[in-house]
Amino acid sequence: MTIPGAGFAGPFAVREFPMTANELRAAELRELLNRYGHEYYVLDAPTVPDAEYDRLFRELQALEEAHPELAVSDSPTRRVGGAPLDEFVSVVHAVPMLSLSNAFSDMQLTDPAERHSELIQFDERVRKGLDAAEVEYATEPKFDGLAISLLYENGVLTRAATRGDGVAGEQVTENVRTIRAIPLKLDGANPPALLEVRGEVLMLKRDFERLNADQIARGDKTFANPRNAAAGSLRQLDSRITAQRRLSFFAYSIAQVGGADWPATHAGEMAWLKTLGFPVVMDSLRPVVSGAAGLAGYYEAVLTARAGLPFEIDGVVYKVNRRDQQEALGFVSRAPRWAIAHKFPAEEALTCVEAIEEQVGRTGAITPVARLKPVFVGGVTVTNATLHNEDEVRRKDVRVGDTVVVRRAGDVIPEVVSVVLAQRPMQPAEGGDLFSAGEEPRYPAYRLPTACPVCGSHVVREEGEAIARCSGGLSCRAQRSQAIQHFAGRRMMDIDGLGERYIDKLVEYGYVQGVADLYRLKLEDLLEMKRRADEDEGVTPETVKAGKVASKWAENLIEAIDASRAPPLARLLFALGIRHVGESTAKTLADWLGTMALIRRCPAALFAALPDIGGVVADSLADFFAEDNNEKALDALLAEVKPADEHAPSPKLRERLDDASLLARLAIPRLTEVRSQQLAAQRSLAWLGQSERRALLALELPAEVVNALADWLDEPGRRAALASLAGLRDEILASLPAAAEAAALPLEGKTLVLTGTLPTLSRDQAKALIEAAGGKVSGSVSKKTHYVVAGEEAGGKLAKAQELGVAILDEAGLQALLAGN
């Protein structure tokens, strides 16, 4: 099924039908436009973009102009908007609230005269009607909100009404009184006896974001856009709800004045309204310009600034500035001849989803993307739109073949807003036929792939996270530049001189496929890379102009790469870019497990047994080292890099690798720490790894705990993994020295704080020495601090230590402590 009119050949063309077909088409268009107008103006729940409504309206308008006999009194072309809501008191407008005729510019055309042809025609009509060589126009943004009329008697607000159908609207006085931007009493000593002001109620972008955040927090439905939020808020029967919605208002015209002089120009009206206390849009957005060229310049300037404005607009408005000229031009049936709304390229449009694919970002985030039938929206042709994440795709139920509403605002990445379900491709339900009533969607619901589309690594989505990620951090082509940039960082491998530009070009030109390739780079590779990069960017260095080749930077970079071949194990682990593994966690792994070989073999439960490593971090570590592509990349890296400080596992592991501790970290349902201790007292890990379900029934534990344990063990691979964990644990414990042999470190259990500048040690060097001696470095002084090491220009931390009576050391005192003195 398609929307009638889809495929229409152009914005002004009239399709040639036999007369009966023209009558049918006109009736069809009237029915569609009445329905869409009701959804937009009355229900505040539009189902099609504004651009689609405008296109159908203009088709009907062109059809009626070509065939006047088709025009009827209730045609949407003779109306302004929707009917008033029944729940509000109806108000007849003393001066009808007419809408404006629309002009459009085809921003795909390069010739300004062609692009703004409708604008030029408007200016020509105005000049001809006034018999004037040039006309001044007042300009202003076309707000995307809800038009209202405000009536003041003797300076006091007595009535507020919506536009409704232009002749009659709804009285919303109590709600409008809650809008702080609207004056309840006019400024000035002598207000007019009667004043009717018209303007727009709207919601600022920031207030819209706050409102939707509040809606989400309460579990309520969010609003699609600021216009819907403003309209829905103003039409609340309970004005207390309106008061909570942070509505704004801008005045843009005067409808009637009594007992005061009416300014002679529109610009004068705006200046007068400002003195009376009305908010009007900033001066820079409402200049007075001359002729079609001035109008076109204003249009393009505001179009460029649109995304940065604090409110939504969908075009601009031009009005003949002088009131006497407005009166001379008069009105047509539905709009003034002296004003026109110039619509921006639609920010929303209908198109079809041809495919759904996945993009992998530099950090491994996997984003579903809709491949679209090309559509012009927001000033550009859009062929792709983000679907954000799997949850969003399912919430909107976007499928291949769907007709969707696509939105592009400013420089924002195009997104799929919603699906037009009435146009979803359907097929007979399974087991049915073409004549049966049952139908089902032709295309299935979207499912995120389990393997990365770039490298084939496993896709991991952590509990509570909306984003799924590729686990092949070291090997994934999409993540290559980011992975290398992190790897080379100062606190990681500290490869000085290897910046983002060089990394991107090394990857782009194929010199580096992974981190291991850095160590195979030759001087000529770097020089050739830079020559190509400069050429691509149109840069000619001074040395090249002089016929020379600057190579010192490349020699220094090769030296820096070579200097990183024997890093501390903790730095190497941090450099791998494992998700959730920061500097502190990397140090814990290095201190407790000692070697990369052992770390690579550990399952999640063993990682979780280490201090300060929780389940999420443990799972991330295990997933990283279990991924085949990462394993290959790590093998290649370790052929070039050898950690300088590998050592035997920490003797303290003996206290953490007992059966009860490991069982408690396996996340077995119902197996609490207490139950883990009870189970470990009866059976070993090795026994559980080989046990049959019936053997578990003999355990002295509650039946629900035993059943949960049995179900967990029955999952494929669980018993083998448990047996492997037990075997690795036993191997580690067997390698540990006897308890008596384990020498205590000089700063074991001590917390130190560094402040000021030390004579010979940098902050990082001092921290490394303290941690190697078993101590912990904290960033703040407290009663639990054992020592503060103070250098020159020590600040508030020194004063805090003196206040708390904490021992204070200089660098010599620290060295003495490290030596065990």
UniProtKB/Swiss-Prot annotation:
**Residues that coordinate or bind NAD(+):** 50-54, 99-100, 140, 163, 200, 319, 343
Q: State the family named in the UniProt similarity comment for this chain.
A: Belongs to the NAD-dependent DNA ligase family. LigA subfamily.
DNA damage listed as a keyword = yes
What is the required cofactor set for this protein?
Mg(2+); Mn(2+)
Where does this protein hold Zn(2+)?
Answer: 452, 455, 470, 476
> Catalytic positions?
142 (n6-amp-lysine intermediate)
The gene designation is ligA
EC id: 6.5.1.2
What InterPro entries does the annotation carry?
A: BRCT_dom, BRCT_dom_sf, DisA/LigA_HHH, DNA_ligase, DNA_ligase_CS, DNAligase_adenylation, DNAligase_N, NA-bd_OB-fold
Name of the featured protein = DNA ligase
* Stretches assigned to the BRCT domain: 742-821
Question: What NCBIfam families does UniProt report for this protein, alphabetically?
Answer: dnlj, PRK07956.1
Q: Which HAMAP family match?
A: DNA_ligase_A (MF_01588)
Provide the transmembrane region boundaries: none
What is the originating organism of this protein? Chromobacterium violaceum (strain ATCC 12472 / DSM 30191 / JCM 1249 / CCUG 213 / NBRC 12614 / NCIMB 9131 / NCTC 9757 / MK)
- Entry function: DNA ligase that catalyzes the formation of phosphodiester linkages between 5'-phosphoryl and 3'-hydroxyl groups in double-stranded DNA using NAD as a coenzyme and as the energy source for the reaction. It is essential for DNA replication and repair of damaged DNA.
In its UniProt record, which GO terms are filed under biological process?
A: DNA repair; DNA replication
Ordered alphabetically, the record's keywords are: DNA damage, DNA repair, DNA replication, Ligase, Magnesium, Manganese, Metal-binding, NAD, Zinc
Disulphide bridges, residue numbers: none
- Protein origin, superkingdom: Bacteria
PANTHER family assigned to the protein according to its UniProt record, in alphabetical order:
CHROMOSOME TRANSMISSION FIDELITY FACTOR 18 (PTHR23389), DNA LIGASE (PTHR23389:SF9)
Gene Ontology MF terms: DNA ligase (NAD+) activity; metal ion binding
Cross-referenced PROSITE patterns: BRCT (PS50172), DNA_LIGASE_N2 (PS01056)
Give the catalytic activity: NAD(+) + (deoxyribonucleotide)n-3'-hydroxyl + 5'-phospho-(deoxyribonucleotide)m = (deoxyribonucleotide)n+m + AMP + beta-nicotinamide D-nucleotide
Q: Name one GO cellular component term.
A: cytosol
Is Repressor one of the keywords?
A: no
